[in-house]
């Protein structure tokens, strides 16, 4: 049996983090979403076909040492069904299909029992997903895409993990494109349902569809809480380390710093002196958190520098960023209500605590503050003394035009 993982999309709801990387390459607990998926399935399959598109080179480079992986280019993103069809000439038997933006804990053993099966998950807001109605013997009798609340047949949703027979390719080839002009895998599933040939198996463990920035942080928290301590880096004098902490070889923790796990600090990173790294934080390779800076519940991507007197909370900071002194990310509203985030032009409720989502190659001057939930596009410059309370597009230069008045001092 082989597997197909769908990795070609752009992940626009996760901008600006996905402006310069495929969504499956966003790190969760220090490694890409896609690596978590591959680890869950590689013992079941002979070959793993990654259907790639946007920023494909980053996926190919990262997994180049894995002999099971081959790549199929989806030049135009014409739907999930079209993505599966690109693998038709490579698949000779039953196969797995997985969305490249999910993360889960359960084994897939149970779905392998059936000829055609879909993994299901219970969620709190099923109206945002494809919702499934189960009948006798786990047969799926209905699949509704994002139904209204009053039309919900259950709280079980399509979890984006499938085991299918090879003849599904024939169904896909004969589908009529959707209103969006796309070939949808769910339309093929509906054909199987009509013929009584699709089963649903509920996942009992954690599952998350990584659709928004706060989903990244939530999954990161979950998987960080499973780590086992391993300290291989250099720990200097008067450093306090509590909880489960991974400090890779080549990392340096300078004097009088405090680290409270779960935390991962990757190779080449420097922390301190006098830095405070709080729980649920990941510092990717070659990051620098300097004197009197505090990081809490955040993911700091590679080569980013937060040198001094700064606070980053519940945030995702892109690669190659450089924060000026006293850069602050606010992460909580006065009224304790969920932070509102602009997603594709619409305000969306997120979670109670959410800081800033900052793209790659962003630089800030001294005393820059970000209000909760703001997004800063890649390659932007934020000048000194700015309070950022709206999203900033990529390649922007933001500065404050205060007038400085100079007069002669009176005696």
UniProtKB/Swiss-Prot annotation:
Keyword check for Methyltransferase: no
Annotated region described as Pyrophosphorylase, given as residue ranges: 1-204
Spans annotated as Linker: 205-224
Alphabetized InterPro entries for the sequence: Bifunctiontional_GlmU_arc-type, GlmU-like, Hexapep, NTP_transferase_dom, Nucleotide-diphossugar_trans, Trimer_LpxA-like_sf
Top enzyme class: transferase
Pfam families, per database record: Hexapep, NTP_transferase
Binding site for N-acetyl-alpha-D-glucosamine 1-phosphate: 80, 130, 142, 158
Active site residues of this protein: 308
Pathway: Nucleotide-sugar biosynthesis; UDP-N-acetyl-alpha-D-glucosamine biosynthesis; N-acetyl-alpha-D-glucosamine 1-phosphate from alpha-D-glucosamine 6-phosphate (route II): step 2/2; Nucleotide-sugar biosynthesis; UDP-N-acetyl-alpha-D-glucosamine biosynthesis; UDP-N-acetyl-alpha-D-glucosamine from N-acetyl-alpha-D-glucosamine 1-phosphate: step 1/1
The keyword Coiled coil belongs to this UniProt entry's keyword annotation: no
Catalytic reactions on record: N-acetyl-alpha-D-glucosamine 1-phosphate + UTP + H(+) = UDP-N-acetyl-alpha-D-glucosamine + diphosphate; alpha-D-glucosamine 1-phosphate + acetyl-CoA = N-acetyl-alpha-D-glucosamine 1-phosphate + CoA + H(+)
Residue ranges of the region described as N-acetyltransferase: 225-411
Record-level GO BP terms: UDP-N-acetylglucosamine biosynthetic process
Name this polypeptide is given: Bifunctional protein GlmU
Naturally occurring in which organism (per UniProt): Methanococcus maripaludis (strain C7 / ATCC BAA-1331)
């Amino acid at each position: 049996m082989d597997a197909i993982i769908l990795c070609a999309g752009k992940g626009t709801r996760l901008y600006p983090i996905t402006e310069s990387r495929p969504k499956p390459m966003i790190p969760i607990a220090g490694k890409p979403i896609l690596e978590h998926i591959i680890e869950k399935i590689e013992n079941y399959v002979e070959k793993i076909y990654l259907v790639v598109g946007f920023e494909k080179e980053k996926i190919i480079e990262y997994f180049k040492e894995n002999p099971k992986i081959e790549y199929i280019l989806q030049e135009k993103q014409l739907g999930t069904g079209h993505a599966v069809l690109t693998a038709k000439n490579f698949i000779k038997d039953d196969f797995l299909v997985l969305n490249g933006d999910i993360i889960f804990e359960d084994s897939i053993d149970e779905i392998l029992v059936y000829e055609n099966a879909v993994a299901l998950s219970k969620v709190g807001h099923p109206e945002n997903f494809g919702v499934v109605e189960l009948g006798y013997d786990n047969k799926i009798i209905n699949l509704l895409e994002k139904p209204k609340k009053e039309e919900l047949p259950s709280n079980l949703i399509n979890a984006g993990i499938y085991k299918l027979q090879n003849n599904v390719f024939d169904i896909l080839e004969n589908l009529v494109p959707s209103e969006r002009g796309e070939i949808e895998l769910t339309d093929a599933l509906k054909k199987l349902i009509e013929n009584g040939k699709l089963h649903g198996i509920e996942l009992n463990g954690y599952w998350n569809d990584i659709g928004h920035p706060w989903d990244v942080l939530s999954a990161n928290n979950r998987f960080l809480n499973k780590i086992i301590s391993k300290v291989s880096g250099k720990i200097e004098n008067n450093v306090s380390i509590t909880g489960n902490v991974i400090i890779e070889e080549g990392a340096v923790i300078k004097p009088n710093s405090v680290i409270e796990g779960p935390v991962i600090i990757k190779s080449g990173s420097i922390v301190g002196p006098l830095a405070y790294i709080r729980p649920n934080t990941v510092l990717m390779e070659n990051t620098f958190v300097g004197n009197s800076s505090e990081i809490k519940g955040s993911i700091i991507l590679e080569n980013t520098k937060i040198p001094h007197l700064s606070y980053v909370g519940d945030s995702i900071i892109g690669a190659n960023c450089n924060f000026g002194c006293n850069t602050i990310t606010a992460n909580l509203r006065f009224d304790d209500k969920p932070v509102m985030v602009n997603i594709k032009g619409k305000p969306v409720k997120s979670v109670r605590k959410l800081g800033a989502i900052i793209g790659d190659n962003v630089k800030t001057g001294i005393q820059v503050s970000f209000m909760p939930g703001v997004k800063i596009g890649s390659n932007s410059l934020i000048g000194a003394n700015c309070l950022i309370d709206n999203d900033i597009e990529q390649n922007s230069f933001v500065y404050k035009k205060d007038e400085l008045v100079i007069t002669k001092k009176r005696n």
